A protein has these predicted regions:
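Catalytic-core segments of nucleotide cyclases and related cyclic-nucleotide turnover enzymes
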Residues: 4, 15, 30-56, 123, ...
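Catalytic/regulatory signature loops of cyclic-dinucleotide turnover enzymes
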Residues: 15, 41-63, 79-90, 116
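Catalytic core regions of nucleotide second-messenger enzymes
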Residues: 7-23, 52, 118, 154-161, ...
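Catalytic core of bacterial c-di-GMP phosphodiesterases, primarily the EAL and HD-GYP domains
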Residues: 29, 98, 102-107, 134-201
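Alpha-helical scaffold within the catalytic cores of cyclic-nucleotide enzymes
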Residues: 2-15, 42-45, 142-151
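Catalytic strand-loop-helix junctions within cyclic-nucleotide turnover domains
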Residues: 1, 15-18, 22-40, 65-68, ...
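Active-site core of bacterial EAL-family cyclic-dinucleotide phosphodiesterase domains
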Residues: 72-128, 166
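Flexible, glycine/charge-rich interdomain/linker segments that couple
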Residues: 22, 28-31, 50-75, 159-167
């Protein structure tokens, strides 16, 4: 604990700029002394990865559950690109109404029609995509699905309806959101006001 506190309070000054260091420590309690050191380090590192986005926690301990979770996450990451190409992600629309019950539009919800595991809710993959930054690819895909549906509604005379889509804060780091959305508005000839964005934390 002393070491942790000392490192957490460290400050480095470079060219009049002050940087505070935030420490993440992964701990692997050795069960088998014959195990290669490299594997021990991998397990400690795996533990530290679980708290990288948690600024209130600086120490994490490795356990069997972490290994199983890591394997599951890697499987999702490995299957994600092909799932996008095969359009396994499906948009479900949840109606949005006013106080009188009149429909104003809908909220776009994503589900993964997995070829082996069946229909998966967002709880099964969103956190992993957020953690790895891949969420921007899924968001772009969903925006296009929503824009396409708005275009269909317009042709059917239902252009008064809107669709709300999610946008992750991480999207701002990976893509030009303005350019993507303008492109969709032009491609499907829809009103930009009808594609509403809801920022997720």
């Amino acid at each position: 604990d002393k070491i942790v506190e000392q490192i957490r309070s460290m400050q480095k000054e470079f060219t009049n700029s002050l940087f505070h260091l935030h420490l993440y420590i992964g701990v692997y309690e050795i069960a088998n002394r014959e195990e290669p050191v490299s594997k021990m380090c991998d397990k400690a590192n795996l533990a530290s990865e679980t708290i990288k986005n948690d600024y209130k926690t600086c120490i994490a301990y490795y356990d069997r559950h972490l290994l199983e979770q890591s394997i599951a996450e890697r499987k999702i990451i490995g299957e994600f690109e092909e799932a996008l190409e095969q359009e396994e992600f499906v948009m479900f629309l949840q109606p949005q109404t006013n106080e009188q019950g009149k429909m104003l539009g809908a909220e776009a919800l994503v589900r993964w029609q997995h070829p082996e595991r069946g229909l998966l809710g967002p709880y099964a993959f969103i956190d992993v995509l957020e953690k790895t930054g891949l969420i921007h690819e899924l968001d772009k895909y969903m925006w296009e699905q929503a824009a396409k549906k708005l275009g269909e509604w317009k042709k059917e005379g239902k252009e008064e309806y809107h669709i709300s889509v999610n946008i992750s804060a991480k999207d701002f780091y990976f893509i030009n959101i303005y350019k993507v959305l303008v492109g969709l508005v032009e491609k499907y000839q829809i009103s930009p006001k009808k594609l509403k964005l809801e920022i997720t934390e």
